């Protein structure tokens, strides 16, 4: 992992020094994608954590109510809704032109919408 470089110092540092600690503390889970041609080369990684969408995320209560009205029946209108947060996403500079970031975003979207593994409807 020491050779991973996505062009962002904070993202590079996280995968090398912090990802395991975040996982151990149950703050975020990091997934690593290795290159097909070289199983030791980290092509990309992403971290996920639990989140929520709530009233404080909107400019006004009216905006939040409009958001809820179009998505939930009246009896399911809560003050907050479960979500999954994409905390970090880094693609190694050597692999930038391979659409790996797009692949990861589509994977996350289908993982949580098609199979609905955690009962959430939103990705933040």
Predicted regions and their residues:
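Conserved acyl-donor/pantetheine-binding loop and adjacent beta-alpha core of acyl/acetyltransferases
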Residues: 45-88
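Residue-level recognition of the N-termini of beta-strands and the immediately preceding loop/turn
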Residues: 29-31, 82, 120-123
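A short, internal acetyl-CoA/4′-phosphopantetheine-binding micro-motif in the GNAT/acyltransferase core
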Residues: 87-97
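Short amphipathic alpha-helix that is part of the acyltransferase structural core
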Residues: 1-21, 25, 41
């Amino acid at each position: 992992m020491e050779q991973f470089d996505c062009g962002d110092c904070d993202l590079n540092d996280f995968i090398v020094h912090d990802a395991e600690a975040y996982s151990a503390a149950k703050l975020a889970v990091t997934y690593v994608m290795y290159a097909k041609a070289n199983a030791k080369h980290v092509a990309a990684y992403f971290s996920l954590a639990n989140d929520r969408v709530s009233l404080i995320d909107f400019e006004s209560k009216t905006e939040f109510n409009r958001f809820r009205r179009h998505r939930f029946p009246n009896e399911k209108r809560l003050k907050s809704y479960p979500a999954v947060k994409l905390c970090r996403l880094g693609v190694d500079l050597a692999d930038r032109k391979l659409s790996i970031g797009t692949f990861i975003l589509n994977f996350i979207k289908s993982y949580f919408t098609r199979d609905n593994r955690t009962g959430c409807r939103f990705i933040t």
